[in-house]
């Protein structure tokens, strides 16, 4: 299993709605994430910068790239687009983060 992290940006004042929507994550989206190999998925917020920091685990044979092709992922991105920075294709703008330290 590999652990990866990435950063996204939430629009100011949208944290309560972001949390509300994720608290009610669609079951079919959760199923699609798991089917792609995603596990132990966390998203943290830095209130000062409005950055969201996501951390997840994935196996070597993950299918995360294929998620973008699914209807449920595209619908979720459209649903979340008013809350966060997105690219022209509607997906959240993500910046991969480099691991700097790990303690088991």
From Swiss-Prot:
<dbReference type="InterPro" id="IPR011008">
    <property type="entry name" value="Dimeric_a/b-barrel"/>
</dbReference>
<dbReference type="GO" id="GO:0019301">
    <property type="term" value="P:rhamnose catabolic process"/>
</dbReference>
<dbReference type="GO" id="GO:0005737">
    <property type="term" value="C:cytoplasm"/>
</dbReference>
<keyword id="KW-0119">Carbohydrate metabolism</keyword>
<dbReference type="InterPro" id="IPR008000">
    <property type="entry name" value="Rham/fucose_mutarotase"/>
</dbReference>
<comment type="pathway">
    <text>Carbohydrate metabolism; L-rhamnose metabolism.</text>
</comment>
<dbReference type="InterPro" id="IPR013448">
    <property type="entry name" value="L-rhamnose_mutarotase"/>
</dbReference>
<comment type="similarity">
    <text>Belongs to the rhamnose mutarotase family.</text>
</comment>
<dbReference type="GO" id="GO:0062192">
    <property type="term" value="F:L-rhamnose mutarotase activity"/>
</dbReference>
<feature type="binding site">
    <location>
        <position position="41"/>
    </location>
    <ligand>
        <name>substrate</name>
    </ligand>
</feature>
<keyword id="KW-0413">Isomerase</keyword>
<feature type="active site" description="Proton donor">
    <location>
        <position position="22"/>
    </location>
</feature>
<dbReference type="Pfam" id="PF05336">
    <property type="entry name" value="rhaM"/>
</dbReference>
<feature type="binding site">
    <location>
        <begin position="76"/>
        <end position="77"/>
    </location>
    <ligand>
        <name>substrate</name>
    </ligand>
</feature>
<comment type="function">
    <text>Involved in the anomeric conversion of L-rhamnose.</text>
</comment>
<keyword id="KW-0684">Rhamnose metabolism</keyword>
<feature type="binding site">
    <location>
        <position position="18"/>
    </location>
    <ligand>
        <name>substrate</name>
    </ligand>
</feature>
<protein>
    <recommendedName>
        <fullName>L-rhamnose mutarotase</fullName>
        <ecNumber>5.1.3.32</ecNumber>
    </recommendedName>
</protein>
<comment type="subunit">
    <text>Homodimer.</text>
</comment>
<keyword id="KW-0963">Cytoplasm</keyword>
């Amino acid at each position: 299993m590999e652990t990866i992290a990435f950063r996204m940006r939430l629009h100011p004042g949208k944290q309560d709605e972001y949390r509300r929507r994720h608290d009610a994550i669609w079951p079919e989206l959760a199923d699609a994430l798991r089917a792609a190999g995603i596990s132990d998925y966390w998203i943290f917020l830095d209130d000062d910068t409005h950055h969201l920091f996501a951390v997840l685990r994935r196996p070597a044979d993950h299918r995360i790239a294929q998620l973008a092709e699914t209807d449920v992922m595209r619908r979720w991105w459209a649903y979340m687009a008013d809350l966060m920075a997105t690219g022209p294709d509607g997906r959240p703008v993500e910046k991969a983060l480099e691991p700097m330290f790990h303690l088991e």
